[in-house]
Design a protein with these regions (language model features):
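Membrane-interfacial terminal anchoring regions of lipid-handling membrane enzymes
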Residues: 1-71, 77-83, 88-97, 105-111, ...
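Conserved nucleotide-cofactor-binding alpha/beta core module
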Residues: 100, 104-136
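Acidic beta-strand-to-loop metal/phosphate-binding motif
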Residues: 159
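Flexible glycine/proline-enriched surface loops and loop-helix/loop-strand junctions
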Residues: 162-163
Length: 343
């Protein structure tokens, strides 16, 4: 099966105009007929993203992992596609097998996106349904599939909660852990099961978030009790901006597999959250946002010129925003500092 032939109309709809993605995919998609050939193109594509939209990319901690073992990577979530794509790329280059990616069913509404997601070892977490029974069935199937993958010595990546952390607060949802445990809850306690899965915490951080303005507008509305209505193509637009727009320095820090003692899902989620927050590597924009919002300076290792550059960047982003939206913009950048300090 040629992926281009399977959805020719959708192919013409790819929203990566005036950039490399459309040109690159135009010449390469014809050769895709299996996961391996896609992942070779995926490698080249991620390298182009890094070379053309990222100033510096680092991934630390992979030496703690065994290339012969499978893991459950639980990550914070800032960008719809790049969080997992960049880590998968780093693993691939370090000699590890690439992982399977858990994605929400909201990304399956556009056919070409759905096809590409599935081909790149992605599977759906079905969170919606006509009845509670339908939802439970979908979550049970996802739980069973995660177990099946790990049992076959294949790794899995999943975000620590549903959706991106648009407010900049990285927290692990206990309900996510209960969903993962669902399939084996009668055989193993939750701590036993998660120790068996070998949970690895992951923190990804971006100097510049291409979707920061949209996130600020949404958070300002919801925090004021107003309804935020997502447009039909909003997720697709976010994917395109996240891939093509400048991101500055990008860091991924990978922790060692966690050991759990408690059988309380809240305590397990707190342990994962703390690990991810400790791993998070702040950038100059995080400190600049704190200065803009709090008029205080926290200790950091960046030069004065770098901080001023970041302040200018944030001010340019905030120019088009209302007072409440500006504060949400700054907040999404500095929250990581508050949380690392235990706030």
């Amino acid at each position: 099966m040629c992926i281009r032939d399977s959805f020719p109309k959708a192919y013409a709809f790819i929203p990566f105009k005036n950039f490399f993605v459309r040109r690159f995919l135009s010449s390469k998609l014809r050769s895709i007929d299996n996961i391996e050939s896609y992942q070779k193109i995926f490698e080249n594509l991620v390298e182009k993203v890094i070379n053309q939209s990222i100033s510096s990319f680092t991934c630390n901690g992979l030496e703690q992992l065994d290339t012969n073992h499978s893991y459950l990577f639980i990550s914070n979530h800032r960008d719809i596609t790049l969080d997992s794509a960049l880590l998968n790329y780093a693993l691939y280059k370090a000699g590890h097998k690439t992982f399977n990616i858990a994605v929400g069913d909201n990304l399956m509404n556009t056919k070409w996106v759905a096809d590409l997601m599935r081909l790149n070892k992605s599977f759906i977490i079905q969170r919606s349904g006509a009845t509670k029974k339908d939802i439970y069935k979908g979550l049970s199937l996802a739980s069973e599939y995660i177990h099946e993958l790990i049992n076959k010595n294949e790794s899995v990546w999943i975000a620590q909660k549903q959706g991106r952390a648009k407010d900049g607060i990285d927290s692990t949802d206990p309900a996510l852990l209960k969903m993962i445990h669902l399939h084996k809850r009668k055989e193993f306690s939750i701590s036993e099961y998660f120790n068996e899965l070998k949970v690895v915490p992951v923190a990804v951080s971006y100097e510049y978030d291409p979707n920061d303005i949209n996130k600020a507008i949404e958070c300002a509305k919801t925090n004021q009790g107003k309804d935020y209505i997502k447009s039909s193509n909003e997720d697709i637009s976010s994917i395109a901006k996240g891939i093509t727009d400048k991101k500055g320095d990008v860091s991924i820090n990978v922790g060692s597999p966690l050991k759990f003692v408690s059988d309380d899902s809240d305590q397990i989620s707190d342990q994962i959250t703390k690990s991810i927050r400790n791993l998070y590597e702040p950038h100059s924009t995080n400190y600049a946002a704190y200065i803009k919002s709090k008029n205080e300076i926290l200790d950091h290792s960046f030069s004065e010129s770098k901080i001023n550059e970041s302040i200018n960047y944030l001010e340019s982003r905030a120019m088009q925003l209302t007072k409440h939206e500006k504060e949400e913009l700054y907040s999404q950048y500095y929250q990581c500092l508050i949380k690392k300090m235990g706030g």
